[in-house]
Amino acid sequence: MSKFVKKIKIIKPDDWHVHLRDNEILNQVIKYTGKFYKRAVIMPNLNSPITSCLKSIAYRNRILKSMHLNYKFKPLMTCYLTNSTSPKELEFGFSKKIFVAAKFYPNGCTTNSKTGIKKISDITPVLECMEKIGMPLLIHGEEINQNIDIYDREAKFIEKTLDPLRKKFPKLKIVLEHITTKESVEYIKNNDVNYLSATITPHHLMLNRNDMFYGGIQPYLYCLPILKKNKHRMALRKAISNGDKHFFLGSDTAPHLHKNKINMLGCAGIFNAPSSLLSYVKVFEEMRALKHLQSFCSENGPKFYNMPINKETITIIKKPCKIIKKINIGRNVIIPFLSGEILNWSIESD
């Protein structure tokens, strides 16, 4: 596509990694996902994690009840894996389309992961079942150990956990989520796209770790996996700009109340739903790779999940769009990524 492109029409995208939270936060943030995306994979790490079919059905009903009339989408539910997860529960949930995937959180890796897995070998029967039935395993890929530098956790995870896992279960479908490193890009590109893929967030494509400390600590840029060196950001950008089928859209939008982002122990997570799609467009434009935007946003994900590609389209136009400054949650607020900033692209109204 020419650098002078003023309008882009693509198949309506899906977001393959979304945190909606619950209750009042859910009610206020949900429309921003619905505005841009047809389907969304919903993360299960609530305060009370989604560990069963019954919990998933109840949470999905709360999501559907909260949806904005004009911004509806299909929530795709996931199961939070624990040492108590039953293979039969997973198989039943997957067969009945209650779950589209199961999520592996290493213990202590991120928000609400205290009941996550300490050793992946502890859930071998679950993984055997998932490989057998073709159920995707979604992975937060960080090796959690106080002796491992936080900037090295993702690379160490590939070496110590992911590579042995794939050798043991070669036909287990795996999504390495929100990748942040050159090592992840290289490892994934060298493996079968039918069994290993990755999602990439807009903030890891746009920022490096210097941004988190520019002019002082920037709590709203603190996320996990943490922002990395610029060489890693450039590896991510190169991966998507080449049209590689291994990579697809997963925003990892993660809302937290302002007071919880700026307190003594600030929460990890970036709420980017109001700007995520437009941010991806910005990156693809900068990389002169707009011809690959549709495959990354709308095609690679459903192909990996063996789901139909959406029939609807969305039109993006070269028109300034100001990102909302804040979202009110009772007496509290949530501040979105790129709050108050102006992006060069907008969604064309019907």
Curated annotation (Swiss-Prot):
It catalyses: (S)-dihydroorotate + H2O = N-carbamoyl-L-aspartate + H(+). It is an enzyme of class 3 (hydrolase). The keyword Zinc applies. SUPFAM superfamilies: Metallo-dependent hydrolases. Binds 2 Zn(2+) ions per subunit. It holds the Pfam family Amidohydro_1. Zn(2+) 1 binds at residues 17, 19, 103, 252. Its cofactor is Zn(2+). Keywords: Hydrolase, Metal-binding, Pyrimidine biosynthesis, Zinc. One of its GO terms (biological process) is 'de novo' UMP biosynthetic process. One of its GO terms (cellular component) is cytosol. InterPro entries: Amidohydro-rel, DHOdimr, Dihydroorotase_CS, Metal_Hydrolase. Substrate binds at residues 19-21, 45, 140, 224, 256, 268. Pathway: Pyrimidine metabolism; UMP biosynthesis via de novo pathway; (S)-dihydroorotate from bicarbonate: step 3/3. CDD domains: DHOase. Zn(2+) 2 binds at residues 103, 140, 178. Its EC number is 3.5.2.3. GO terms for molecular function: dihydroorotase activity; zinc ion binding. The active site is at residue 252. The modification N6-carboxylysine is found at residue 103. Gene3D superfamilies: Metal-dependent hydrolases. Homodimer. Catalyzes the reversible cyclization of carbamoyl aspartate to dihydroorotate. HAMAP family: PyrC_classII. Belongs to the metallo-dependent hydrolases superfamily. DHOase family. Class II DHOase subfamily. This is Dihydroorotase. It comes from Buchnera aphidicola subsp. Acyrthosiphon pisum (strain Tuc7). The lineage of its organism: Bacteria, Pseudomonadati, Pseudomonadota, Gammaproteobacteria, Enterobacterales. The gene is pyrC.
